[in-house]
Structures are given as structure tokens and as C-alpha cells.
Amino acid sequence: MRQRNKPWADEYLQENNHIVISDPKSKKGNWSQLFNNNNPIHVEIGSGKGQFILGMAKQYPEINFIGIELAKSIIVSAVQKIEEENLANVFMLNENAIDVREMFADDEISMIYLNFSDPWPKNRHEKRRLTYGRFLEQYQDILGANGEVILKTDNRGLFEYSVVSFSQNGMNINEINVDLHAIQDETNVMTEYEEKFSTKGQPIYRCKAAFEK
């Protein structure tokens, strides 16, 4: 779905630089100082309008969260929600996550969430998928011991591709779920897309995978 342009987005994000970190590369290795604690740090790549990361931050105040979203017209919605809730354990990055190692140091992150990522279904676009090998190499570097990558998607093709990619890149598969809502996981926090697709009866797929460290 094409997002409407919001001319005020740039100014709004600058005004809320206490939520949107403008130079994340300078914080590499020092995110705990920014949060002012040593709690685990979880990262969501592709946060959209922020429903998931806001819900997680409220549900788990003992965990720090960082959401990455490239589209200014979308991330402003997440920032507005965080500002309204006055949450201290979540920051947003208006960045392209093409190489997360530029923003995070080795072993600095405890969890990575990939929620309803673009499936890039054409073979020639395989390298753009966030579960492609070169991305997994980056995740391996920044994840600490026992750190997981958690994928949720409505796209079976991306799900199957990702499970294979995880395995081929040395990850242990901790969970494979082909109908997440059938198990009624009370800890599951839904994204906007997840609510939309699940109300239509579409199965939601989830996979949890981890590197051995």
C-alpha cells in the first residue's frame, strides 16, 4: 500500500530527537548508556507504525527496544504513540537497515524481530530478503549468546525460504509454527498487518532461530 506523503514528517522527527535517534552509528557499542541501564536490547527491523514495538515496550518494561523504520511517513505514527505513552525503554531509528553492524556492536543485541518483512518473491530479488545469508551474517555478529531471530509473516514462500536459510547459515531452529493464532499464545503481540490478516482467517507463520555462541 502506498503511503501518503507527510510534508511535516522531517520537522516532527527532528523535534522528537529524544525518541528518534538521528545518528545511531555514533551510539554503536553504547546503547546501554543511552537507555541508562544494562537491560537486554531487542531490535525490530521494519517497525511500521509501531504497534508491535509499543506493545512489547509496555509489556516488558525490563527490556529495551529499538525500532528501525526507513519510511518517514510511517515512522511518525510510531513516534507519536511512544510520545503519548511516555515510554523510556524504546527508541526509533529512521534508517535503512542494510547493514546493522554499522549501528550495533558485536554481541550488543539480545533479540531481533522481523515482522511481516517484504517477501521480495522474485528470484532476482533474493538478496533483498531480510533472511538472506548476508543479513544473517550481520545478525550473528550483533546478537549475544542465546540471542534469537524471530520471524513472523503471512507469506508462506518467505517463511519456507527463511527456515531453509536459517538452517543453511548455521542457525538452530527453536520453533516452527505454521498457524500461530491457533495455539493462542498470550505473550504474542500483534502488528498492524497481523491483525488485518488474521481477521481474514489467514494463517500467521512464526519461526524462532538462534546461532550457537
UniProtKB/Swiss-Prot annotation:
Keywords recorded for this protein, A-Z: Methyltransferase, S-adenosyl-L-methionine, Transferase, tRNA processing
Binding site for substrate: K122, D154, T191, E192, Y193, E194
Coiled-coil blocks: none
GO molecular function, one term: tRNA (guanine(46)-N7)-methyltransferase activity
Reaction equation(s) it catalyzes: guanosine(46) in tRNA + S-adenosyl-L-methionine = N(7)-methylguanosine(46) in tRNA + S-adenosyl-L-homocysteine
SUPFAM superfamilies per UniProt: S-adenosyl-L-methionine-dependent methyltransferases
GO cellular component: tRNA methyltransferase complex
Binding site for S-adenosyl-L-methionine: E44, E69, N96, D118
EC category name: transferase
UniProt keyword Transferase present: yes
Annotated segments matching region Interaction with RNA: 124-129
UniProt-listed CDD domains: AdoMet_MTases
EC number: 2.1.1.33
PROSITE patterns associated with the record: SAM_MT_TRMB
Highest taxon in the source lineage: Bacteria
Active-site residues from the entry: D118
Pathway field: tRNA modification; N(7)-methylguanine-tRNA biosynthesis
Primary role: Catalyzes the formation of N(7)-methylguanine at position 46 (m7G46) in tRNA.
UniProt cross-references to HAMAP family, sorted A to Z: tRNA_methyltr_TrmB (MF_01057)
Family of the protein in this entry: Belongs to the class I-like SAM-binding methyltransferase superfamily. TrmB family.
NCBIfam families, alphabetized: PRK00121.2-2 (NF001080), tRNA (guanosine(46)-N7)-methyltransferase TrmB (TIGR00091)
Protein name: tRNA (guanine-N(7)-)-methyltransferase
Species the sequence originates in: Oceanobacillus iheyensis (strain DSM 14371 / CIP 107618 / JCM 11309 / KCTC 3954 / HTE831)
Organism classification: Bacteria, Bacillati, Bacillota, Bacilli, Bacillales
Gene that encodes the chain: trmB
